[in-house]
Amino acid sequence: MPVRKQDTQRALHLLEEYRSKLSQTEDRQLRSSIERVINIFQSNLFQALIDIQEFYEVTLLDNPKCIDRSKPSEPIQPVNTWEISSLPSSTVTSETLPSSLSPSVEKYRYQDEDTPPQEHISPQITNEVIGPELVHVSEKNLSEIENVHGFVSHSHISPIKPTEAVLPSPPTVPVIPVLPVPAENTVILPTIPQANPPPVLVNTDSLETPTYVNGTDADYEYEEITLERGNSGLGFSIAGGTDNPHIGDDSSIFITKIITGGAAAQDGRLRVNDCILRVNEVDVRDVTHSKAVEALKEAGSIVRLYVKRRKPVSEKIMEIKLIKGPKGLGFSIAGGVGNQHIPGDNSIYVTKIIEGGAAHKDGKLQIGDKLLAVNNVCLEEVTHEEAVTALKNTSDFVYLKVAKPTSMYMNDGYAPPDITNSSSQPVDNHVSPSSFLGQTPASPARYSPVSKAVLGDDEITREPRKVVLHRGSTGLGFNIVGGEDGEGIFISFILAGGPADLSGELRKGDRIISVNSVDLRAASHEQAAAALKNAGQAVTIVAQYRPEEYSRFEAKIHDLREQMMNSSISSGSGSLRTSQKRSLYVRALFDYDKTKDSGLPSQGLNFKFGDILHVINASDDEWWQARQVTPDGESDEVGVIPSKRRVEKKERARLKTVKFNSKTRDKGEIPDDMGSKGLKHVTSNASDSESSYRGQEEYVLSYEPVNQQEVNYTRPVIILGPMKDRINDDLISEFPDKFGSCVPHTTRPKRDYEVDGRDYHFVTSREQMEKDIQEHKFIEAGQYNNHLYGTSVQSVREVAEKGKHCILDVSGNAIKRLQIAQLYPISIFIKPKSMENIMEMNKRLTEEQARKTFERAMKLEQEFTEHFTAIVQGDTLEDIYNQVKQIIEEQSGSYIWVPAKEKL
């Protein structure tokens, strides 16, 4: 039966009629599928195919209508007949094709230094193109993010290499001659002449119904964006791919960051969370992350992006009343004029809800909400500082006008967008009584039936209560004090993550009445400790909350410790005196929490690894007096810290001790039971029991003496630990004017398109390079394919003297070599919290791979801890990245602290 255009039009009409009747929610998927078919019917491609079919059946097969039978037939006659037909006869060439579909005359391929070029098109891409997927996501972690133009260390990019593309020969069969588009099956023939024909959605006739994670195709819009590559690249970062999905199992390629001043930002159309479908003519749906990056690298100077994004969401306006509490309003904000939280949007957004604060208790305000007004003060088109001031200048009763996203986001299972403007420092502000800088809110107690932060003292029962704990690897997880003159046994400390903390039933200030029916009301400290030690795995404790008695007891302990400290300092019996050392500055090589040290004789001083301390009184063997040194100068606060001798003695005792609860701590962490001999009768750890044995003394990290030194160069940066490559890439892409990489040396012969001094320093003499390595002129070197490769001290120095941080992808051994060369690097170790933490940041890792990564990190820490400038930890890569940026900024001054030659 011949195909007629009017039949197609009738079918289209019937489909549209049927679609209009599908108004129920359950019909949404069917309606979406019908819309796809309608779009196909209405496309230029489909109409062209109908025209061809009709022309073939009606005109070519019915020769009498257009051919004189008296003339001999010619093989080319059908083509001639088609050319004089009444159909549109505009020639389809690269000039008349829409710009969006015209292929480039030249193709460019990326040639890696030592690996063969990969294929342009992913093996997954066939004629049957799978529909793209897109979910609305927040920028939750940088772990899967690859920057389009960020390259570090030895990953040098060779210049693009043009190769001529061969165009197909004209067709010799009776079909419409069209210029094929690579990786697509597209035929373009307008049914009516158009001066500027619109771009046609490629392969609309073969698109399958996509498996949308959130929403249908009706929820999305499509756009073609043409960018001209600038000096700093395309100016955006991507994440995702089949090998490392950005969100869940969605393998789409997402835009995760728009770099201010880059090509994408100047164009203004590309947005964070856009999904890239094609780069020029390369389909990047359902491809690996590296394939997408390769497509962007090879795209040339003019890059056409076909993107898909979720349609703008409507907002619901509501008013929220909050009553200020001890923690203020209890939320953080970001955004404002000049400090956009989301590119192109000056609004003020809620970025964090602080546990136990007013907003948390009220429950209505959520992350991602937009603040429109506070009381009568409008917060639209205001600066960040103005918004903070308005929120701080409120009374106890605060009325917030907020715009909430509709349920389109609420049903996603992912948080609304929380995107940090890449061009500025993070400036989240907590709206609390005295906080202008962002602080990380305490994580909720996951296993506690009621969050302890929400309950006030008045809400906790004062009656005796029974608590059952199961002893874990950290014992019972609390410390006790008391037991003198029948004053009672009190809980003085709850170990985070221990059985007591996870139960949520015990708290500091509880008096222990009994343990497994053993009455402790009049027990001594030793009797209470023995009862807890011998209680077995399941321990039943009767406790009573007595905060007033505990406060009086604490005051008494404080007075005793003050007397001891004054007596100790006045006796001056220590081996290290301030009279012997005029000024003593040290760098801490461990974290110290004064609340975990029950032996402090006076007010303690908290510090963390890498902090600089000015020891102003080192005359005592056990305790020093010190103040912290910050980038802004010395702190006024003076506190007590454990001496080097005390730290090492306690740590060695811990390493030589067999503990009944197999208690373990991280290397360099101060034991919780650090106490003074004079107070032994009033404090102990409820889960410690020591049986010492003799063993070889271990090297213990405590303090490193340092001197301040002026530098006239920009310090190199070495990042070690899991996900370091992602962090390095992001630093270079976000701050191309502040970070760079040095040119390595190699004995490999130069290739035709390479430039000496740009791609590599090509060394003609292997013997000379080996000699330079022996003379320590290289911070790191190795051999690959019988060629030497290495990074020289001079190459690093050249980058440093240009005012850029040289990003180095090297081992920990390079830190010491740079220090010897008087190039003191900023060395940062990313310490994973656990195997699960690693797998969360890189979802494609197997459990075995995560275990090996974790073990490598622990070995790295053990081997190079004393050489690290700082150690960072975080739940997400975004947290870690922000910490790294802050550390680099703090360490970038003209005066730095370097290891001193003298020893403690």
Swiss-Prot record:
Cited PROSITE patterns: GUANYLATE_KINASE_1, GUANYLATE_KINASE_2, L27, PDZ, SH3
Modified residues (Phosphothreonine): 115
Coiled-coil zones: none
Keywords, in A-Z order: Cell junction, Cell membrane, Cytoplasm, Endoplasmic reticulum, Host-virus interaction, Membrane, Phosphoprotein, Repeat, SH3 domain, Synapse, Ubl conjugation
GO BP, sorted A to Z: actin filament organization; actin filament polymerization; amyloid precursor protein metabolic process; astral microtubule organization; bicellular tight junction assembly; branching involved in ureteric bud morphogenesis; cell-cell adhesion; chemical synaptic transmission
Phosphoserine: modified positions: 122, 138, 158, 232, 568, 573, 575, 579, 598, 619, 684, 687, 834
Region (Required for interaction with MARCHF2) location: 224-546
Segments of skewed composition (Polar residues): 682-693
Region (Disordered) location: 662-693
Tissue: Abundantly expressed in atrial myocardium (at protein level). Expressed in lung fibroblasts, cervical epithelial and B-cells (at protein level). Expressed in the brain (at protein level). Widely expressed, with isoforms displaying different expression profiles.
Domain of life according to the entry: Eukaryota
Main location: membrane
Record's subunit section: Homotetramer. Interacts (via guanylate kinase-like domain) with DLGAP1, DLGAP2, DLGAP3, DLGAP4 and MAP1A. Interacts (via guanylate kinase-like domain) with KIF13B. May interact with HTR2A. Interacts (via PDZ domains) with GRIA1. Interacts (via PDZ domains) with GRIN2A. Interacts (via PDZ domains) with KCND2 and KCND3. Interacts (via PDZ domains) with KCNA1, KCNA2, KCNA3 and KCNA4. Interacts (via PDZ domains) with ADGRA3. Interacts with KCNF1. Interacts with CAMK2. Interacts with cytoskeleton-associated protein EPB41. Interacts with cytoskeleton-associated protein EZR. (Microbial infection) Interacts with HTLV-1 protein Tax.
Family statement: Belongs to the MAGUK family.
The protein's name in its UniProt record: Disks large homolog 1
Lineage: Eukaryota, Metazoa, Chordata, Craniata, Vertebrata
